Amino acid sequence: MDHLSSYLRSDTWVMRDDLTGFALGGNKVRKLDFLIGDALAKHADTLVVSGASSFSRNAAAAGKVFGLDVVVLVSGDEDDQNRISQAFFEEFDAQVRFLPDDAATGTAQAQLRDELTDQGRRVYELHPGGSDAIGTLGYVEAFGQICDVTDHAGVHFDRIVHASGSAATQAGLAVGSAISGYVSDLVGIAISQPESVQRHRVQNLAAE
């Protein structure tokens, strides 16, 4: 980090969420801490999630650890799938259901939820990327850890820069900042949406 700090002319720190230590790690683990807790509190026995993403892979691992069945909806057929995701789903006994490429994932997930509920399952639906009010708490907690670093290392972070995709990371950091009173510029880099759309998503999620 010394070279990067020198190049940027700033004291640059990195929060290593790739080393969160569960399954493949990453920021989604923070969200799953709260989402799995909520699922267990509601006595769910089945998780439903869409996409062959890092979030779905970590959800499959979490389901296995906590005794929850996991059903994953993915677009395309088996030959189209990411091999890493396939291996993870097989390793952790997640059931995979394939959808036509043009299928509406949200509608298909709702239909699957109803189907499993009719079979007597207690279903807990996971939003894409774990980005709902519960998952956002993972990054409210993360901001508390940033405050802890400030206290222990004696450094104040004037600017916190992060990727902003499904909005929960930025929303959680914003809420954590407001709760703690820690003054810092939060800079989210929108990775998939125009700034105006992403700003609206973050604000709505933070308000929940």
Language-model segments: residues:
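PLP-dependent amino-acid enzyme catalytic core
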Residues: M1-E208
